[in-house]
């Protein structure tokens, strides 16, 4: 896919919008989010306009994660001294994706930062239900 004029991330890649760049390779770019959840909140994107997670090659997905890991390490070692990191990838409207250009969030975490992830982690599903879901996913993986 090619860059689109209405994609904010494509405009950052091509230099028509400013960004505080952190890491750049031939195929990926990382920069600070202009509306950060916490200080140091970064985004890691492919330079090519790829809207969805499924559009990424395995190599490119690995590169994005490797860059995110490097940034997480740097955030801990920097004067920001973050105490932890969350990686977050929203894929699709139901997952609250707002910019339809693949991107991985790197959220530095600090004690008392107020950022929360609200979910019902204690659903305690039935083993048979888990096995049924696993079968559906394995079948779909086999049809790739």
Model-derived features: where do they sit?
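HIT superfamily nucleotide-processing domains
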Residues: 1-144
């Amino acid at each position: 896919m090619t860059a689109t004029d209405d994609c904010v991330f494509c405009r950052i890649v091509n230099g028509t919008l400013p960004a505080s760049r952190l890491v750049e390779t031939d195929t990926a770019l990382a920069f600070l989010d202009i509306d950060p959840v916490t200080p140091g909140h970064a985004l890691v994107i492919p330079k090519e306009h790829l809207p969805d997670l499924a559009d990424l090659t395995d190599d490119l997905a690995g590169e994005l994660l490797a860059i995110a890991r490097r940034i997480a390490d740097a955030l801990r070692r920097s004067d920001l001294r973050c105490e932890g990191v969350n990686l977050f990838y929203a894929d699709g409207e139901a997952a609250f994706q707002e910019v339809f250009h693949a991107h991985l969030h790197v959220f530095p975490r600090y004690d008392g930062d107020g950022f929360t992830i609200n979910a019902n982690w204690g659903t305690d599903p039935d083993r048979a239900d888990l096995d049924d879901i696993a079968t559906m996913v394995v079948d779909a993986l086999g049809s790739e």
